[in-house]
Structures are given as structure tokens and as C-alpha cells.
Amino acid sequence: MSIRTLNPGPLWNHFADLNEVPRPSKKEEKVIAFIKEFGEGLDLKTYVDKAGNVIISKPATAGMENKKTVILQSHLDMVPQKNADTEFDFETEGIRSYVDGEWVTAEGTTLGADNGIGVA
């Protein structure tokens, strides 16, 4: 079963989209571009700093401008691990995730949920 069928829908759809983007540690260029395009697509202030951090800023809701700012943070990369019998290129392929009973898992590789679910 596809993870896109899970609830809450927006979370799992974002996670599925993210897992389509190769993002092994030390090779985050593709996922940085993906997240940057995501923020820009929502017309949010979006930039990438010298370290490769993607910062997306959303203005306060009307009437909440004087409230404290909330910051959500998570890392974009994932540790590229696969089963010995699995052919997979973490630099060019997206993670093939699916639902197995009560678990979300991946076909022969790590799922990328640390910290991909935080990014989603």
C-alpha cells in the first residue's frame, strides 16, 4: 500500500515527495534545491545560507504579529544504508517506501524517516 493513503494526508504526501529526492549525507544538493523550490512555490521568503541550510520564513497570521516566533528545524540528509542483496544508488534513486501492515518501511533500504518525517 502507498504511504500516500495514510492520514494525516498532507504529512505523508510531503514525506513521499521528499523520499523521491536523493539525499545521502554529504550530497544534499538535490534535496536543498527541492526544499528551496517548495518554499518559493508557496511565495514564502526562502533562502539557502553558506552552510546549505534552507531557511523558509512565513509571516505571522493577522493579529498574531506580536507573538513569539516559532522555529521548526530538521536535517535534510539521510544515512545511505541498504540490504546486502539490494541494488540501489542513493545518489540517483528515490527511496521506495510503502506500508507493510502497521509499519511504513522501504524496499531494501533505510526509510529516511530520521529526519525526513521532521522535514515533511
Cite the ranges covered by each PLM segment.
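Predominant activation on well-ordered alpha-helical scaffold segments within soluble catalytic domains
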Residues: 12, 16, 33-36, 119-120
